[in-house]
Each structure stands twice: as structure tokens, then as C-alpha cells.
Design a protein with these regions (language model features):
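PRPP/pyrophosphate-binding module of the type I phosphoribosyltransferase fold
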Residues: 82-164
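Extended interfacial segments that mediate partner engagement and assembly in macromolecular machines
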Residues: 1-67, 71-75, 95
Length: 164
């Protein structure tokens, strides 16, 4: 993660995620590109893959914060975005779960929606918060089930402070 998920950054990310402040994505993307953009560009044919949310959660929020972040990073860095990964099963909110509970909850929760448009290259999963790794692992697993050779890395806006 580019930043620790604590104090003011935590408040800001919660506004971005839960309070409709999707315009924050542009500022976050500028900071992510400034601090870690060279890392993202070093991969072979990198493309951005936002971690999907379930359609019910999308209806509640009106947007997917990871997709907003990926689109803003795409504009800033010129990297393509592929939104062919889908959340096929709605899961309970993960915030209060242990790492083991998160892993169990996310088993089989992702799938490939659009294989035809799937680029060749390194998939960079984009998300707002890295907590236990369960979400990015489940996304990578879904991608590798369909394309075993797929290189998958992740780039998050924040990482929970207790993990550093």
C-alpha cells in the first residue's frame, strides 16, 4: 500500500468508500503514481484490474471505489483498465473478520466475466485497502483458474497499520 490506513488517511478512505466522495480517486491516483508509479510501469505489458464489488453493493454505493481508483490511475499513467473480473457472490462485509474467516468467505466469490477482452501481460489488481491479502489472493486465484500463466500483482492505496 502507498499509505498506512490510519488517522486522517483512514477517514479519507472511508469517505471515498462509503460517503460518495468518488472524486477523491483523482488525488489518490496522483499520489500513488508519484510515489509508486515506476514500480507499476516496470512490469511486462501492465494492465489495471479493479477488485470488483458485488452488484448489490454497487447499487448501495453507486460506484466501485477500486474501479474509480483504477480509472484515475489509467488517466494519470496511460495504463489500460480491464474490468473483466466480477464478484460472482455477495459476501458479508469483511472488516471485522479474521484472516481465516475472510479466506473462507471469499472462496469462489470471483470469476471472469469477459475473457475475450482480457489483455496479455501483467495484471495489477487495484484496491483501496490491503488487510490480510485474502481479497487479492481470491482474485488472483480466479484469474489463474482460467489462465494459469497469468502474472498477477497488487497495488493498494492503503495497508492496515497493524500489518507493517
Amino acid at each position: 500500500g502507498t499509505f498506512l490506513y490510519q488517522d486522517g488517511m483512514r477517514e479519507s478512505v472511508e469517505q471515498f468508500k462509503y460517503e460518495g466522495m468518488k472524486e477523491y480517486a483523482k488525488g489518490y491516483a496522483a499520489l500513488m503514481a508519484h510515489f509508486e508509479g515506476e514500480w507499476a510501469e516496470r512490469w511486462e505489458n501492465p494492465f489495471l484490474v479493479p477488485v470488483p464489488i458485488h452488484k448489490r453493493r454497487y447499487q448501495e454505493r453507486g460506484y466501485n471505489q477500486a474501479a474509480e481508483l483504477a480509472k484515475a490511475l489509467s488517466v494519470r499513467m496511460g495504463l489500460p483498465v480491464w474490468e473483466g473480473l466480477a464478484r460472482t457472490r455477495n459476501t458479508a462485509p469483511l472488516q471485522q473478520m479474521s484472516a481465516a474467516q475472510r479466506r473462507r468467505s471469499l472462496e469462489g466469490a470471483f470469476g471472469i466475466l469477459d475473457e475475450r477482452s482480457w489483455p496479455r501481460g501483467t495484471a495489477i489488481l487495484i484496491d483501496d485497502i490491503y488487510t490480510s491479502g485474502s481479497t487479492v489472493e481470491a482474485c488472483a486465484r480466479a484469474m489463474r483458474q482460467r489462465r494459469p500463466e497469468q502474472m498477477v500483482v497488487f497495488w493498494t492505496l492503503t495497508i492496515r497499520a497493524e500489518l507493517t
